[in-house]
Amino acid sequence: MSLLTEVETPIRNEWGCRCNGSSDPLVIAANIIGILHLILWILDRLFFKCIYRLFEYGLKRGPSTEGVPESMREEYRKEQQSAVDADDGHFVSIELE
């Protein structure tokens, strides 16, 4: 009994694979999953600091208002709104009659 597997069977005095050109959907799916896994692994190793920083600190936007009195929160909101209102002068308002 040979220790060679089916994939390692010598073909025409060369080592080759009998499954080349296989159109089996399971083989195609396995190849796609393998390629995606490799791509994700490479991206993970390249950008792991950025990725895990997002998980560590979350996707918070803007300053935290935790522990800030409500009066200061309202003052901050008014300042932000006044900054937005000041920019409205740059736009042209067209009114239809």
Swiss-Prot record:
The chain crosses the membrane at residues 23-43. GO terms for molecular function: monoatomic ion channel activity; proton transmembrane transporter activity. The keyword Lipid metabolism does not apply. A lipid is attached at residue 50 (S-palmitoyl cysteine). It is found in: Virion membrane; Host apical cell membrane. InterPro entries: Flu_M2. The keyword Ion transport applies. Residues 44-97 are intravirion. The modification Phosphoserine is found at residues 64, 82, 93. Residues 1-22 are virion surface. Residues 60-85 are annotated as: Disordered. It holds the Pfam family Flu_M2. Glycans are attached at residue 20. One of its GO terms (cellular component) is membrane. The record marks 41 as: Seems to be involved in pH gating. Keywords: Disulfide bond, Glycoprotein, Host cell membrane, Host membrane, Host-virus interaction, Hydrogen ion transport, Inhibition of host autophagy by virus, Ion channel, Ion transport, Lipoprotein, Membrane, Palmitate, Phosphoprotein, Signal-anchor, Transmembrane, Transmembrane helix, Transport, Viral ion channel, Virion. GO terms for biological process: protein complex oligomerization; symbiont genome entry into host cell via pore formation in plasma membrane; symbiont-mediated suppression of host autophagy. The M2 protein from most influenza A strains is inhibited by amantadine and rimantadine, resulting in viral uncoating incapacity. Emergence of amantadine-resistant variants is usually rapid. It is a single-pass type III membrane protein. Belongs to the influenza viruses matrix protein M2 family. Homotetramer; composed of two disulfide-linked dimers held together by non-covalent interactions. May interact with matrix protein 1. Cytoplasmic tail plays an important role in virion assembly and morphogenesis. HAMAP family: INFV_M2. Forms a proton-selective ion channel that is necessary for the efficient release of the viral genome during virus entry. After attaching to the cell surface, the virion enters the cell by endocytosis. Acidification of the endosome triggers M2 ion channel activity. When the channel is activated, one or more imidazole moieties of His-37 probably become bi-protonated. This is Matrix protein 2. The lineage of its organism: Viruses, Riboviria, Orthornavirae, Negarnaviricota, Polyploviricotina.
